[in-house]
Regions:
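Loop-helix junctions at membrane interfaces
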Residues: 1-214
Length: 214
């Protein structure tokens, strides 16, 4: 399989997986806001194959969502792309420049901050248009709804991406789909595994609490 064919196949595979997890994995978080894990797939693709892969997959998945399951039209599609890219592409760009454990952690943390800041601004500017709410009403939801949602979303994205990266790249190398030089070989310290695991557990507990389950 030549490089161009492999890139097309990889992009299509990631887009298909990301779309499936959107369809089957939507979780209510706060009010009308739902979390889906597609950004984990998109970010893993970017960390392994570069930020352009993250961008391409996020566009493809968002367009498919728009014409199948989304009710928010083109503006909702754009919001999806901006949200995914602000996290995934930020992480992938930083990791591409520094393919080390520190680079991966820095990228994920920077992606989390970027997504929260970008989406707070975009929710204020764009959400009133496609939601049909007055901007004043949306502004009142920024702190009690949009901020915790984006913090939880970025926490889950960063945590699962970190924990899944090594196992997935190991499988890809063993199957010959990824060269040994294509990924960083450093082992993840136990402390970071525990940290990101704790982040995931905390986010899940908060979501359950917000939904009145616990």
């Amino acid at each position: 399989m030549n490089n161009n064919t492999k890139k097309i196949t990889t992009t299509a595979m990631l887009a298909a997986i990301a779309y499936v997890v959107v369809v089957v994995g939507r979780i209510p978080v706060v009010l009308f806001l739902k979390y889906d894990p597609k950004d984990i797939i998109i970010t893993l693709g970017g960390l392994i194959w570069g930020p352009l892969t993250s961008f391409t997959v996020s566009v493809i998945v968002s367009l498919i969502e728009m014409v199948t399951i989304s009710e928010n039209g083109i503006l909702g599609c754009i919001m999806n792309i901006v949200s995914s890219c602000s996290f995934a592409c930020t992480a992938a760009v930083i990791y591409k420049k520094k393919r080390t454990l520190k680079g991966a952690v820095t990228g994920l943390l920077a992606g989390s901050v970027a997504m929260v800041l970008v989406m707070m601004l975009w929710n204020y500017l764009i959400a009133p248009i496609y939601m049909g709410y007055p901007r004043e009403a949306v502004a009142k939801l920024l702190i009690p709804a949009f901020l915790p949602f984006n913090l939880l979303k970025s926490g889950l994205n960063a945590g699962f991406t970190f924990l899944l990266y090594k196992p997935i790249t190991t499988v890809l190398r063993r199957t010959g789909y990824l060269s040994e030089s294509a990924v960083e070989q450093n082992k993840k310290p136990v402390g970071l595994w525990l940290f990101f695991g704790a982040v995931i557990i905390t986010c899940i507990l908060l979501i359950l609490s917000l939904n009145g389950v616990i």
